[in-house]
Amino acid sequence: IYIEEYKPLAIWQFRKEIIILDRDGYHIERIQNKDSHNNLLLVYGDEADLNLSEFIDALENFPSIRKRIGHVTFIGKRRWDLHFKEGVKIQLPMGNTYDVLLELDQHLKDYNLIEKGHKKIDLRIKGEISTDRIFKSNQ
């Protein structure tokens, strides 16, 4: 007999269901209340469960970003939005999640965007960051 234990990593809220996921998006169990699992990453969006692994692999390299995340949303079955606990929405482009998070991490340090009160950061155009003004990256 072989027993495999799945390690809970995220809570996926989709439509009216709340499901605990492992890092590969495997549905561990349905739950009624997400509040009892507030240590897990909260995830929204159609097919977020199928795309979680690549996102988590990248995010694990950026603990300073991870600790700020209140929840993430998979948009249009192709890209992620990060929602920070401070009320900031960060729009990521499709693909290359690691590179984009590296760029975001650097921008947050260089420009102090959160501390300056920016509530929306758009990284969907490569080499640019826009909030209420546009910043050109050095890439």
Which functions belong to the PLM regions below?
Residues 1-139:
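Charged, solvent-exposed interaction patches on well-folded alpha/beta domains
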